[in-house]
């Protein structure tokens, strides 16, 4: 702290030794004015007061501040000291020479006028008390301005806006705006000057002016670089000190000749100097007319002043040429900074051998062309000089985009090290790795992902085109389009007709969707001995097959001929040229089948065999057609008594395919002809090529296991053929013992039951005496084809089984055949009631004997242990009387038992 008593002793007391409030306020005001002075101006005051001039700005300010505050000391209050310092500050602002402080203080204490003191001090000879001339030494700028000033009168205010007007009072001078490298101020328009006053509401200021002919021609020339700009600055009550930023009152609305100016004249908030002047050039009128400029503002708290100047524009490209002429940042300086940075990392415990530098401009995010930065920047990253200049033309922040320090155009330089890297690396390089010795390595982007994406994109159209071409070549305009979806997994099995496509569930579903329509033109009765082989071969071949009628006349060659479709299928898979011929054959078969569905073929009256027909209403179900209930289906209402049904079953709530059979071959499941079974997936209509249309004998199907725990699996049993009755063979499917499996009895409950109104007759002594000694069938359904044919006329007809149900052959597994020596449990109830109710049945076929059957106890679920009741079901398992849906498809009302067992 500098002791003022060492430099100044005030022994002469003032007129008033007690400080007043006015004196305190005057001291504070003088200190505020002093803090706005520059360092050179502070030194001038220190010279006048005989204070040392060495030190920083803060030291000089503290010295003068303490000198003023000592004037308020009790007993030593000095109002003349404050007036003297204030007079010196006023002389500095007027760029006038300063007198010696002691002379000034004595004149103030004696009451000498200030003008006389100034003249005497400036003209009088040096005195003994003065250690320096009366005119304090000034800076070169002040001496240059002072030399033009008269000693007897003040200089008139210049026309140049850079000059300041001088007066004895605190007059507001003209504003000297901060210079911009993008334009040079040429001339002021005297009439285009407006003042913005402080207002609490809406205010408006306007100016009217005319341009001279020379000025108008200069501004209206399209190739001219001159513009008419409107500047605005805030008035400082302490006076303008130069380099004032451009600031417009906000909010505002600027209009020139009733056209609103939409230039960005606001800039960034809380960042003075980022606003641009308003360009009035495009809206000027000819020199013979008067121009009107209006500024509407509101709620201004400070005064503003607006000036119109004619300026000369400088483009960023012209500034870039100047930057390129500046000295470059040499490579050695960059390498030194790089080594220093890596060394600092090592001192901090970080082992850094290299660093990565981006070659992209942080302003445009494009590859740099003119890598530059300020000479004061302490970083390695550069930016593009041209992009930087264009960005400053829009919003003049003049800050480094990397480190945010202020940048002057004179300090902008090109980096020689980065420019050398840009010249020697490829254009697609965005980053380089730098080492401490200055070596760099280009970092290339990994283009494998983009290449793979482009390759996939190029392959996809080709693949789609090939599929489209194949589709067009294999289709005909007059024939239906059939798409073959056989996968490659079917090819190995196509070579062997005895191997079924039973690999996995996906293959099984694929076979379900690839079944095609089959036209049956032969009789199955004449080829009974070879049914198994024929059916097995037909299952392996999922394409369209047309069996010739000669197949029925040659019993011994039937098996060999049935192998032909399987071999043809193998050839189709191996030879792509045969696909078109097969598709045409399939289309012709389908077309012929559609034409023949509504025609009935009558046989001769003297023939003992029934007539052939392709009418689906005649319910020509062959043994190979299999129906598996998958989901709950909507079926017509059945009016029969539900208590007379055999093999009552729970509904398939989960909608899954039952697992009680295997997909080895085509085991039969008979359903009622009045039930319309819909498949969950679309399938092509088909029928077995080796089975008869109307001569199928009645079938016996074990629908469930014995409730007492018998493990006899469900199997469709066909009695031997008799010439005088309608009989059926044991099974039309070829069963392989190693592929047969016995599933848990839970899934066997998913089989379908059939109405008891269907009348069945048997005339086989082996069936009545040996296989079924007690003439009682537990869980069996006996159907006759004749009865099925007549029921189509008595019940609402819906197609019994769609022809595409043959596609379920591969998805429905088959249990092994029923042993012939297994005894059938008889009903303990000797009421003599038949197993099947025949009250509403159709007339029986002639020459047939009815098997006396007793009414069986109702089987609800084979997994529930037997109850002591015999005729009444538990309430939880009682049938719904209000259900309008037939129980054939398993739509029983289930509660706890159904949920428990079906969930397994």
UniProtKB/Swiss-Prot annotation:
Residues 34-68 form the SAP domain. Zn(2+) binds at residues 377, 379, 400, 403. Phosphorylated in early M-phase. A zinc finger (SP-RING-type) spans 344-431. GO terms for biological process: chromosome segregation; DNA double-strand break attachment to nuclear envelope; negative regulation of protein ubiquitination; protein sumoylation. Residues 162-314 form the PINIT domain. The lineage of its organism: Eukaryota, Fungi, Dikarya, Ascomycota, Saccharomycotina. Pathway: Protein modification; protein sumoylation. Acts as an E3 ligase mediating SUMO/Smt3 attachment to septins and PCNA. May be involved in chromosome maintenance. It comes from the Eukaryota. InterPro entries: PINIT, PINIT_sf, SAP_dom, SAP_dom_sf, SIZ1/2_SP-RING, Znf_MIZ, Znf_RING/FYVE/PHD. It comes from Saccharomyces cerevisiae (strain ATCC 204508 / S288c). Its EC number is 2.3.2.-. Residues 1-21, 122-170, 443-584, 596-616, 672-733, 877-904 are annotated as: Disordered. It is found in: Cytoplasm; Nucleus; Bud neck. Belongs to the PIAS family. Residues 1-13, 444-454 have a biased composition (Acidic residues). Keywords: Cytoplasm, Metal-binding, Nucleus, Phosphoprotein, Transferase, Ubl conjugation, Ubl conjugation pathway, Zinc, Zinc-finger. One of its GO terms (molecular function) is SUMO transferase activity. Residues 127-136, 561-574, 596-611, 672-683, 721-733, 877-894 have a biased composition (Polar residues). This is E3 SUMO-protein ligase SIZ1.
